[in-house]
Curated annotation (Swiss-Prot):
Naturally occurring in which organism (per UniProt): Rattus norvegicus (Rat)
Keyword Nucleus: yes
Tissue-specificity statement: Detected in heart and skeletal muscle.
Subcellular location: Nucleus
GO molecular function: TBP-class protein binding
Record keywords: Acetylation, Nucleus, Repeat, Ubl conjugation, Ubl conjugation pathway
Gene: Cand2
HEAT repeats: 2-36, 37-74, 82-119, 121-157, 167-205, 209-246, 248-284, 292-329, 364-405, 409-446, 469-506, 554-591, 602-641, 685-722, 727-764, 768-807, 809-850, 894-931, 933-968, 970-1003, 1004-1040, 1044-1081, 1085-1121, 1142-1178, 1194-1231, 1241-1273
GO BP field: protein ubiquitination; SCF complex assembly
CC per GO annotation: cytosol; nucleus
Listed name of the protein: Cullin-associated NEDD8-dissociated protein 2
Amino acid sequence: MSTGAFYISSLLEKMTSSDKDFSPKSLGGSRVLDPLPWLQILAAITDWISGDRTQDLALPRFMATSDLMSELQKDSIQLDEDSERKVVRTLLRLLEDRSGEVQNLAVKCLGPLVGKVKEYQVENIVDTLCANMRSDKEQLRDIAGIGLKTVLSELPPAATGSGLAISVCRKITGQLTSAIAQQEDVAVQLEALDILSDMLSRLGAPLGTFHASLLHCLLPQLSSPRLAVRKRTVVALGHLAAACSTDLFVELADHLVDRLPGPRAPASPAAIRTLIQCLGSVGRQAGHRLGAHLDRLMPLVEEFCNLDDDELRESCLQAFEAFLRKCPKEMDPHVPNVTSLCLQYMKHDPNYNHDSDEEEQMETEDSEFSEQESEDEYSDDDDMSWKVRRAAAKCMAALISSRPDLLPDFHCTLAPALIRCFKEREENVKADIFGAYIMLLRHTRPPKGWLEAVEEPTQTGRNLNMLRAQVPLVMKALQRQLKDRNVRTRQGCFNLFTELAGVLPGCLAEHMTVLVSGIVFSLADYSSSSTIRMDALAFLQGLLGTEPAEAFHPHLPTLLPPVMACVADPFYKVAAEALLVLQELVRTLWPLDRPRLLDPEPYVGEMSTATLARLRATDLDQEVKERAISCVGHLVGHLGDRLGDDLEPTLLLLLDRLRNEITRLPAVKALTLVAVSPLRLDLQPILAEALPILASFLRKNQRALRLATLAALDALAQSQGLGLPPPAVRSVLAELPALVSENDMHVAQLAVDFLTTVTQTQPASLVEVSGPVLEELLQLLHSPLLPAGVLAATEGFLQALVGTRPPCVEYSELISLLTAPVYNQVGDGGPGLHKQVFHSLARCVAALSAACPQEAAGTASRLVCDARSPHSSTGVKVLAFLSLAEVGQVAGPGPQRELKTVLLEALGSPSEDVRAAAAYALGRVGAGNLPDFLPFLLAQIEAQPRRQYLLLHALREALGAAQPDNLKPYVEDVWALLFQRCESPEEGTRCVVAECIGKLVFVNPPFLLPRFRKQLAAGQPYTRSTVITAVKFLISDQPHSIDPLLKSFIAEFMESLQDPDLNVRRATLTFFNSAVHNKPSLVRDLLDDILPLLYQETKIRRDLIREVEMGPFKHTVDDGLDVRKAAFECMYSLLESCLGQLDICEFLNHVEDGLKDHYDIRMLTFIMLARLAALCPAPVLQRVDRLIEPLRATCTAKVKAGSVKQELEKQDELKRSAMRAVAALMTNPEVRKSPSVADFSTQIRSNPELATLFESIQKDTASGPSMDSMELS
């Protein structure tokens, strides 16, 4: 026998020992006991000494059971079959032990034991517990109930693939049903109902075979004379409703509705309350299934809400809340009545005279059903009106969150009522009233900058203006409450004001006196917990960020002392929050980009003393250390010129923190703040020591430290310049070549920026490192992934190298280094390097030419020669043309005369890369000399139709690079030429023409944009689609002066969605998608008219499907596929930027259609469905049974025999995308209760291929960011 088995055996022997009087032998030798057994032993010793030995001590069994509990909780324990049987038998016997302590320990052992024994032993445990529940002994029944709950809670969930939980639950369901049905013993009924509720909440769907019997067993219990039974039955029915079949749900709903009497019919108040409470429970657990029954339910519930019964009113309002949250679409006709009832009962307080100043303290307990509530909860002496008011407030919050489209009405009706109710005397109710108003604020928050939203004549702007009018009323209502003795009230005020300031920045400035008074009151409140001080500090910090600095100036003498006291607070969280506030105060009141309007002299000493005291302390929490360092950085950076003799000690303290490994990162950031300060402080006392320390940080693996260090070094180099000690600078420069690498582009960019600054301030220091740095930099330029920021930094560095006097590196040497990899290429197998590398090298050549204009003409001439030489390789020609595109504009007219001929010849090159580079150069060079080049370019487009595509590309570049004023003389000629080519049969040509038209419109938008009307009305189909495509190129993601004019024409352009031509409709959808994605404000107000047309384009049109014969095979072609795909892409973009304007139920109808469409569209809709599951869980839940079927069909689809590899890969990707949507749906616990989802989940677990795929997707979701967005424009 192993040591573990022997130990278990010895424990079992002790657990079965008979009771004895206490003796030293019962201690089990000299083993060390846990604290709990020692307490038992101490009590036993006391009784024994006193002579009372009749008590059942049972110490050996108790201690052995405790030891067994410890063993079972170890992962390493393994029981053989014999040990399993003995342990189970012994523990079940101990459940009947005379000692209550032994019983309690034994039942606790059952939890960990479940995972250590075989299934049949678990079933044995469950059988015994069920039998004990029917025992005549009350204590045994209680312990059996606890045991069953313990076992059920420890069973592995069905989602893990284990069938144990399901088999155990099926085994006991029948016994629970019979226990509930028998009326003799209420205690057994209650215990069985509790266990059944727990089972249904965890494993409702897998118990489908029992649902009918459970329903028929539970429904009669709604009429039980015992309140506790009725309440537990209501909870169980709620869980059952979420998991049962549609037929059973309809039966349950019909039962509840049919038994609701008419409001004037005689009925038991208790029976009505129970039925309404059951409706509320079903609404909370399965409200998405109640939508079809609401038209019958709501009139009855509304009538009952008017009866003189506060408990019934509360239940009705709770039911309304559930209905609003779970089926908002179906509640639409009932919203006015619900709103009226909420307004009526939110002020329902018949037992209180509001004119009195005396506030009554009342018990505030949760009214939600739970098994702990007792039958006498609703005593005649209880004032239930506060629960009615709280239910009304919660219902109002649900109303606001479920119907954001009614915000204007809510601001007129709900907002004033909520503000009046801020004086509510009951704290729980007041918290929910605050919550409802905060919900209104959050939905009023505009989706973009608030200032633009206020000025915009849309509904959002009107909502914000209505909110602004409410601010004085809110302030008046909350003025006294900011100093309320109740902490929770003040916290609610701070939360509400924080949200208000975030929605409407600046609106609290004129009320600052009241707010500061309230903040100071809470900061000085040491009688309550520190939480209120932290809340007050957090509110103050937010206020400093949203309100103008001038509003704080008069209040600083009042505000600063309590903040300083909090900085010195012994509790680290308060101190950390106070330091953050102090930092914000400094940054807001004495900004560096504006003149000082407030003299800092009276305050700077106090702030410096308090902060440095925190910084010098050595026993601080890490968060306080970091905040103190940051605060010192802001203090020195903003007010260093007023610190006087304290400046140098403060800098030395920062230097000391720079040496400490724990504080070095915040110290580096603080040093950066000091260095970038326009105060130009003298940092000489620390520079010689700080630079080598910073240099050492560049070798660390901590990326954040390297980035912060490079930023600090660049700031120091810019601010101190020649003041930096050259030896220290060289020590830093020695670390830089290793950082100029494509391994981390951001680090490389900062390193090059620092090199540029050093080159400009201390060029002599670069002598030793310029070679290695240039070598790494040139290697970096060969990366095809080079970001624009790194390229711009490289250009600046190269310009700095040739800009010093004398230059650090000669111009010719740098040009040679840049072009050598291309010029030295052996053979002519094509360009060689990646296309993007040529553009990067060309940009650098142009940057050098711009820095040395005297060299530009010579460089351009050499490039022209290289471009026209028959001996030049393709790579050399491409680089020459791309360089000429950049250099030609600054090279002067000399080389340009010869350049025309060279570029035109190159358009006929056999190399596509050379032709594209020549076209690009022709346009860019022409932009610098429009009078000479543009007429020539237009003439060539007319004369050379075979080169038209390349010449149009050149025209596009010229229009994009030239100044608008310089283009005005040529507008009419270019316009005419472009519209002559709108009917080109080549789609690529039409697309380039559209882009040219878009760029041309920017020259004179008010004159040219209205011309589109004529073209759309009279043009041919190709012309109309080209015009609409051109509109797409007028939309950018940045604000532009054309936006207001464009917005006035959008409605007319969108009428093209009704164009009979497919290409025009597709172009219109593409343009609409670009607008929604980049500038949704252009189309938001038109969605009511656009969406029906958009949805129409998602339908499959049979008249557009045709068969094409390809040899012996027939191939189906769907001409409408591209239009449908464009429509679904628009729908996805609308989810991201216009969610509030969508009717999600209607939206889901078309998503549902897309789930059965073509491969490309299904891929789109799977992504949309995953997004909707996160954004709009309630509507998705309502139709999950319909959504899951196409997903199941996709996941279980079989590939046809003989399919090619491409088909197999497409099917695998489709299956993976569908499974991602399934995984996203299943993140909602309520979705998992759906019978159809539970059935599919079982199917996934039983199929090894699907199970593996599902597990891999879940791991991917857990380890990486989800696909929250998709670029479609």
